[in-house]
Amino acid sequence: MKKNLWITAMLAVGSVVLAKAQYSSKPPEVSPAPMKPEMTEIWEPEVKVVTPAKVLGDAPSDAIILFNGKNLDQWVSQKDATKPAPWKIVNNDHMEVVPGSGGIQTKMKFGDCQLHIEFSAPDVVESEGQGRGNSGVFFQNRYELQILDSYNNRTYRNGQAASIYKDHAPLVNAMRSPLEWNSYDVVYTAPRFKADGSLDYPARITVFHNGVLVQNNVTINGLTLYIGLHHYPEAHGEDVISLQDHGNKTQFRNIWLRKL
């Protein structure tokens, strides 16, 4: 018994020593020779040059343009991916959900990405709660960033605009008033799976709503469900981004993405 206690104590001390070694405030010993500045300079490979947009919110030079207001060439019907996206283009400026037609999804598949998307509630403000300007952005066709008219419109906190639906409420409500355009700027990290199909580590997401941080690198706890608890039922790779038809004439414009 005493021997077991002694071993346990030594293991605990060893763990503390190891932790201190890993996170020491002292610089590592690299050489008996004095350090020079150039010894810690990394020159190759050079960092890729990307030209930023002249207008904040517009696409940088390496972005994939998913929607520019002119056509839906990058999208297909979610009901039948062999058919064109059934939503309508308005004034060569934005697209509008056609209620009952079903969601739409990208032709391309994505994993880790930076996404910019702008949206507006329907022109006519009606209904309340989840019935007002409802839609959603689904990453890898599974994990929903909620779209809702949350301006003076109370609903459950993990279901309002900029929530990771029924998973994480936003840090604040940064919704603009009706008829104004809103923007999401998102950094999404896809989940990773082991060779046997089990989860290695979950998806994570950071969201800025109209320039305001509302999701700070939060863990996505699994598949978005209306009823039930979040989980990761199966392994998957890159997949489409989809926009939800929730029966409201929600509008979208200026959608672009950068693969990360």
Sequence positions of predicted segments:
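Bacterial Sec-dependent N-terminal signal peptides
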Residues: 1-22
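Carbohydrate-interacting regions of secretory-pathway proteins
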Residues: 20-260
